[in-house]
Amino acid sequence: LVKTGISYVSEKGAAENLKAELSGWNFEQVRLDAKAAWNKSLSVFQFESKDSIAKQQFYTALYHTQIAPSLFNDVSGEYRGADGKIHKNNGFTPYTIFSLWDTYRAAHPLYTLTDENVADYANSMLAIQQQQGTMPVWHLAGNETGTMVGYHSIPVVVDAYLKGFKISEDKVWDAIKGFKDYNDLGLRDNRNQDYISAEKEPWSVAKGIEYAIDSYSIAKFAQKTD
């Protein structure tokens, strides 16, 4: 058997994580614990059907929604921020893997019904904004890939705020101001001429539609906090 510790901070952090999470060598116990943990996590829904295939498809899809976001800090509370510096979790638990164009429509609204970590997800995005100057677009392991259409951390955070999760109103406004000043990915043209030129930007129509959704979420937040 081989055990591996993972840390985005240090080798010491990886060793401490491994010791805290898996100190023994009982493979069968680890398997049983993992099975029990997944059964508990998937039990947020009770799906009743005589169609066994439909039931399998439902719980497989639910399982897929729970693969990410992923916990990002060491057991010490340290994590590597979007600025490359080591930070300590302060009032929230940091997460990563925010594939937001894929998840903002359905997965994140689902999390507000089923996932106790929603505030941590939102506060992780707000911390990323403070560290790199912009909200995440497609954030992976402390790094911004910038490979998705839209600026969909905004509607995710606004949705969580409007549903009563513990999120700083001031930090949400800071994030919105960052969106207003962000000029990449066609946003400058979208702001200045109300459309995105296909000659200048790929996926121009898709981006225009997605930015309209982002702007609508900003309007809803403003109505709530005005």
Residue ranges: model-predicted function:
Residues L1-Y95, A127, T134-V137, K166, ...:
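Acidic/polar, glycine-enriched structural segments that form the non-catalytic walls/loops
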Residues G13, Q29, D33-A36, Q56, ...:
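Conserved active-site and cofactor/substrate-binding residues in soluble primary-metabolism enzymes
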Residues G24-E28, E48-S52, T96, T112, ...:
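Hydrophobic alpha-helical scaffolding
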Residues T60-N73, T96-A119, P155-F165, S215-T225:
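Alpha-helical support elements that line or immediately flank enzyme active sites
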Residues D83-G84, F92-L100, Y104-R105, Y111, ...:
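Long, structured ligand/cofactor-binding scaffold of large enzymes
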Residues N117-S124, Q129-T225:
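Active-site cavity-forming subdomains of large catalytic enzyme subunits
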